[in-house]
């Protein structure tokens, strides 16, 4: 899959390597900004309040 | 290359090869399975890496982010704070009368700063109104809106994370009876002394009562109650730390000597 993506990227080798790095960086940003904060609600490490007081 | 690796099931594939021979190299069942398992494998490896990244984000990066925001909050509070940065008189030399009790600010606004020397000489964390994720996940200690303000007779209760997002109460179990806990608000400094802790189930809201766990009793003392997860890296229980008010001094009297250096540092940085 990743090999297929790499083969189908346009441009010479160095451009494709650069594109890959940009894609990986974009994926990381998306994960840190949206995926991880959302997923964090399913972990229980952050339950430090008593009862239902924390409900908005 | 693929032809040479396929040794098993060659009789089936050779029979099919005769039927499906076309202009391109025929796609055999084993090729399809290999392709699918390769994609599946890559996706599973990706999922594994993403999960590891999540663990790193949750246990490390949220602390980095929260620490930066909390330092900023402490600094902006210290900048607005008026009053000398050095103690005017030795501790407990002057009786400043009953403590001034401020009014609770709106949700998300800052009440003050908490100093806990037991948690480290540089432990300065903001206390914010509200206890939902919006407060606790970035700004540290959250004040239960249903409880009193610092200095009031009754219960001043705050929550904080044991792990992740600054881990403001990570060392709550290291408090020793007699340890000082200082709360600084715009009005002054409230000195609490740690009394005891208690481990309870998560639904025990009675720890937030004016006299903790005693319903219908008129409070006589000023209590500081801190709640956090228990055990560390778990949330099956809550650890509660109770402290009682020991003294109060107005902002104009300067900070208690034990935290004078930290107060000055917080303002100096701003």
Give names to the regions the model predicted.
Chain B
Residues 32, 38-39, 49-270:
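Solvent-exposed, non-transmembrane regions of membrane-associated and secreted proteins
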Residues 1-37:
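Terminal targeting segments of Actinobacterial cell-envelope proteins
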